[in-house]
Amino acid sequence: MLRNTHLVLPFILYLLFRLSHFLLEVPTVRMIELAACHQHLRLDHGPLNEAACKTPPVQEHVSLVVGWKMTFDSIPGLMSILYFGTLADKSGHRAILRLCCVGYLLAILWVLITCLFHQVFPVELVLLSSLFLFIGGGQLVFAAVITAFVADLFPPPSRTKFLFLLAAMPHMDKVASPALATKLMEQNLFLPSLVSMAIVVICVALLQMSDVGRETAASKVVGSTSDQTEPFLRSSSNSSQESGTAAPAIDPEQARGPFRQLKNIICWVHREPVLFICYLCFFLKSNAMASEAFIFQYLSEKFGWPLRETTVMRLALSSGAVISTLIICPLANATLHNRGVASARINIGAVHASSIVLVASFIMAWQASSSTAFIFSMLAAGFGEGLEPALQGVLAAASQTKAKGSIFALMCTCSLLGDMTGGPLMSALMSIGRGGNGVSDGYCFLASALVFGAVIVLAHLLWALGAEEMLGED
């Protein structure tokens, strides 16, 4: 029973922690809107009609605060993820996960207090909630550490199957959270925040009561298989393989001056080409997926849907992703492994297949002539969400190390950088075609298809770099 608890608990933690985040997406905006509206109308208390808050000055104020909050919330994770990833390798995963929960709990509490007592605090003070995310690093660090823990917990033959299941957790939250948040907001606007805080407290309690995430947890659960390393894509230097740790990307003793740093980066790419390609794929995947942020606007603009009804796009995307990562990919992975197919062949095959699905889906979205075709294209795009866990399986095998916290921390950093650069790029492409009161031509979806085409090429390159090792890794 204890063994099964160790196996299941990381998935429960990830499901709950991500639910606490998605549950607050809409309520947080509404709380900020309410506080800003009271400030603009100079009302200290009493009921306020939501329609009165839809004036341009109030909405501009809300957009400014929400936009800056999103930016500030990403800074702690970006600045601290490598530190916490390395610390997780040294101190165990549980301590870092607990820190993430504490910091996020304080951030939720700060926003709640600021908006609840809007007659005392200016709404701009919600931006200070981002400071609490330096305690643990927030959602980004939690995702990196829990992924590293699952990768450490399971042996190579079954690792990717469980990474698929882990990837399904946030997609399940995306399906359930809108309806749950709506029901809670109907009772009280501040109730979703209280429920989210309770969920985070449950996560802390689960971490405190269990041994999950301790440094020795993987060896206790996996047994002798935890000492195995996959002879997959042996691009690491001999010294890094012998020591059981991944060679650092940049030597801190030698990284002095821009030319020396550039030289070290080039040497690392030459020494660890597979890791470099994996990180590049994570960057490109996040960059391409940035176009998904515009699907609601595109459905409303091109096909005349009311914006409030475009939430069906979230349901289509998440439903496809849940079916893919929870059912199709794990079953395919287990079936192929039982037939003796090497794990690395399965992983790279999943990267290749998922990328093809995404290319076809985004081309279909670009060429969609009806709202039904567009919705179907996004449902199909959800089936391509197996790309990320498949890449995680390749990365875990290629890292040649038991301490994967820093490896997956860098992975999340690349994904975040992809999000940050993809947003402005896709926004600019989305604006093409609007001249002369026209509608967008949807070139952002074509760009996404082209980027995923590049990922297909990189998947072939991964195969070329390690075909001999892959055929005999298991």
From Swiss-Prot:
In this chain, the stretch annotated as Disordered covers: 220-252
Where is this protein found?
Cell membrane
Q: How does the UniProt record describe the way this protein sits in the membrane?
A: Multi-pass membrane protein
Superkingdom is: Eukaryota
| UniProt biased composition (Polar residues) | 222-244
Q: Which organism is it from?
A: Stachybotrys chartarum (strain CBS 109288 / IBT 7711) (Toxic black mold)
Where the protein is mainly located, per its record? membrane
Query: Protein name, please?
Result: MFS transporter SAT21
Q: So what family is this one in?
A: Belongs to the major facilitator superfamily.
Segments crossing the lipid bilayer: 7-27, 64-84, 101-121, 131-151, 162-182, 189-209, 276-296, 315-335, 346-366, 374-394, 406-426, 445-465
Q: What are the GO MF terms of this UniProt record? A: transmembrane transporter activity
